[in-house]
Amino acid sequence: SIMKMDGSQQEENLDVISTGSLGVDLALGVGGLPRGRVVEIFGPESSGKTTLCLEAIAQCQKNGGICAFIDAEHAFDPIYARKLGVKVEELYLSQPDTGEQALEICDTLVRSGGIDMVVVDSVAALVPKAEIEGEMGDSHVGLQARLMSQALRKLTGHIKRTNTLVVFINQIRMKIGVMFGSPETTTGGNALKFYASVRLDIRRTGQIKKGDDVIGNETKVKVIKNKVAPPFRQAEFDILYGEGISWEGELIDLGVKHDIVEKSGAWYSYNGAK
């Protein structure tokens, strides 16, 4: 199809789904993750990738959205998801056997037009069928990258047409023999880097302690790529174990940053009230 961009065909306002973190929504520049686009969230282990996605699912469901979670890692915890505000009984969950099956399910869900948000957890766990059926130790060079490249070529058109948000969670690997620059890379080849409109790098920066007990993680998110707003913005927030993103803590930190809340020592005050 061909059309004139006179406003009759194209909506000017971008449809977004909140991440559940005020700081990340602000860093994204449009108030959330853009619908009709591919998003990649990557980081080291236990950095909060799945937590951020579950928080976004909870926000989407709050606004009446229908979400699907493709759990290729077979590590979905419904109890934890429920604590984060996810309506587990309304969530479509798939635990596929192969990478091909996972991406086929993703494509079917997107094409149906009845789903608002699909999360794939994770790209690293999308194992090609040939590798699963082969022997341990067999070499399957570039199979996963080819699989991702083909899937994304097929998916992007459907994603745009049905205005679905598709989030891929990804893990980090080290490149061998890198002398200069970062040795870190993400799995699954280069296709996802190109097709993703937004790429978020999430890292654990410290621990939150209550006495001697560790009760959460300090987390930093960098917007590495952004096609819908200026990139390279950052957000910092706390993830409390069993509770998710600390909304109150984030609100106070943002208040201090914008001089709405005053900080003196360990005390915070707003309009004179501590």
Swiss-Prot record:
PROSITE patterns: RECA_1, RECA_2, RECA_3
Ligand binding (ATP): G43, P44, E45, S46, S47, G48, K49, T50
Keyword annotations of the record: ATP-binding, Cytoplasm, DNA damage, DNA recombination, DNA repair, DNA-binding, Nucleotide-binding, SOS response
Subcellular location field: Cytoplasm
Lineage: superkingdom: Bacteria
GO molecular function: ATP binding; ATP hydrolysis activity; ATP-dependent DNA damage sensor activity; single-stranded DNA binding
One Pfam family, short name: RecA_C
GO BP annotations listed: DNA recombination; DNA repair; SOS response
One cellular component (GO) term of this entry: cytosol
Transferase as UniProt keyword: no
Family annotation (Gene3D superfamilies): P-loop containing nucleotide triphosphate hydrolases
Keyword set includes Transcription: no
InterPro entries with a match to the protein in the record: AAA+_ATPase, DNA_recomb/repair_RecA, DNA_recomb/repair_RecA_CS, P-loop_NTPase, RecA-like_C, RecA-like_N, RecA_ATP-bd, RecA_C_sf
HAMAP family noted in UniProt: RecA
Family, similarity comment: Belongs to the RecA family.
Function according to Swiss-Prot or TrEMBL: Can catalyze the hydrolysis of ATP in the presence of single-stranded DNA, the ATP-dependent uptake of single-stranded DNA by duplex DNA, and the ATP-dependent hybridization of homologous single-stranded DNAs. It interacts with LexA causing its activation and leading to its autocatalytic cleavage.
NCBIfam families: tigrfam_recA
This protein's name: Protein RecA
Gene, per the UniProt record: recA
